[in-house]
Regions:
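Short, aromatic/His-centered strand-loop micro-motif at the edge of beta-sheets
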Residues: 41
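Short juxtamembrane and helix-loop transition motifs at transmembrane-helix boundaries
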Residues: 7, 26-38
Length: 125
């Protein structure tokens, strides 16, 4: 059973790799999701895509992985609060609630990874 549960780590890495690649591939299409109070627009889409891919590399290499997944959790929480919660409060698409809950769960997954799977604890004690 522990072998199956250990796969969760790799599923999180796969998820972040896929989302990071999607941000880089479809940056122009996703740029409309950047809140208007964030200057730079599409730059944030590419920045977050690169950040997700770097977190995956960090997790596979075991270097700076605790820091990477702590920061990735904060990044996804910012997505939840500035994009999905704002969309929910605007009364838009009902799917936004599911995106909000997904990102809250993903924040927890990143922080659990940082807490239980990270090998390099040099930056975050």
């Amino acid at each position: 059973m522990n072998a199956i549960l250990g796969l969760g780590r790799y599923l999180l890495l796969l998820f972040l790799l896929g989302f990071g690649a999607k941000h880089l591939q479809d940056g122009a299409e996703l740029a409309g999701m950047v809140p208007p109070f964030f200057p730079g627009g599409i730059v944030w889409i590419y920045f977050t895509g690169v950040a997700m891919i770097l977190a995956v590399i960090s997790g596979l290499a075991g270097k700076w992985d605790k820091l990477a997944f702590t920061l990735a959790g904060f990044m996804v929480l910012i997505f939840a609060l500035t994009i999905h919660l704002r969309g929910l409060m605007d009364g838009g698409n009902p799917r936004v609630l599911f995106d909000l809950l997904k990102d809250i769960g993903l924040t927890g997954a990143c922080w659990m990874y940082a807490s239980h799977f990270a090998r390099d604890k040099s930056f975050v004690g």
